[in-house]
Amino acid sequence: MKMRLHATTTSPFVRKVLVVAHESGLMRDIELVPTNPHTDESLRLDNPLCKIPTLILANGEVLFDSPVVCEYLDSLHHGAQLFPKDGLERWSALRLQALGDGILDATLSRRMEIMRAPTEQSPEWIERWMLASSASLDWLEQHAHLLEEPIRIGHVAIGCALGYFGVRFPDDDWRTGRSSLAVWFDRFDTRPSMRATSHEALSKLPPTQIKSGGPVARQ
């Protein structure tokens, strides 16, 4: 029996899980369940937070959110691991994952705020989320050497964050003044796992038709 993943094709956190599934060669073991977390109350039966991604295991157990789901998937294969087992390398990978997830949180919050009626928007919160994103991108530019390590979960989180930021706020031009980060992202974005889960690729297909790119070698 396959695992079942509550998902939408637009969620960057779902994309993060799918990238890990591709990297681990597990896409064939996952059935994607199209789910709108805002309207589908059946999701709450599996996850009281009613958030995606939510993974239902073959034995009926349920896992959420993306860091938990990603680490679980990474534990199911015997290839190079995205989650180091221990030591400083593990904490470095988890720190980068937290930063990437934080950029995604700020980007999503900012987008939701600007979709409100102009009279209901909070300029203070919009500014705060913009600052969180720009400061994080500056930090990554200053610490770009951390991205040259073997591919870990932090790289996946940062890659998904940059991809989503570029789609939702293209006018921000995050690349200006961050050439090292831009070079890294352009290279990372060519990975089969990133290509198969790009915004353009997923927007053309219903979730149940997402194809597996198979496992790929780590850098």
For each feature predicted by the language model, list its residue ranges:
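GST-like domain detector, emphasizing the conserved glutathione-binding G-site
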Residues: 1-123
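Generic structural "secondary-structure junction" signal
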Residues: 45, 51, 84-85, 153, ...
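Non-transmembrane alpha-helical segments in soluble domains
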Residues: 70, 74, 94-97, 137, ...
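Short, hydrophobic secondary-structure boundary micro-motifs
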Residues: 80-85, 106, 149, 174, ...
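GST-like fold's C-terminal all-alpha helical module
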Residues: 100-186
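Long hydrophobic alpha-helical segments typical of transmembrane helices together
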Residues: 175-219
